[in-house]
Regions:
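A short glycine-rich, His/Asp/Glu-containing loop-to-beta-strand
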Residues: 5-33, 39, 92-93
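Ligand-binding loop in jelly-roll beta-barrel domains
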Residues: 74-98
Length: 99
């Protein structure tokens, strides 16, 4: 079984409704393997190219632009790697409970 880590680089805020993370990746740096147990979205704060690897062995490469908002999939084990030449960052918002 794969050891899972945090969904972001730094936990910024948490209450009963949301959890907000910062994710910062230098070129060729990867996040921890992780699982989002809730619905979530992320907002790109420094654009770049990410490779997403899933626990089932599949992967994808995505170009992400400044300010882009992406809804993520709850329940998939994955990690992302910055395959670009510049630093990449985003803000992740996990939706814990409905408002």
């Amino acid at each position: 079984m794969r050891k899972l880590g945090d969904v972001g680089t730094e936990l910024l805020f948490e209450n009963e409704f949301v959890r907000t993370w910062s994710l910062v990746l230098e070129p060729n740096q990867s996040s921890d393997w992780h699982l989002h147990g809730t619905e979530y979205l992320f907002i790109v704060t420094e654009p770049g190219t990410l490779k997403t690897e899933y626990d089932d062995g599949t992967e994808s490469v995505t170009e992400l632009t400044l300010g882009q908002i992406v809804m993520g999939q709850k329940g998939s084990i994955h990690r992302v790697t910055n395959v670009g030449k510049e630093r990449y960052s985003n803000s992740i918002v996990e939706l814990i409970n409905e408002l």
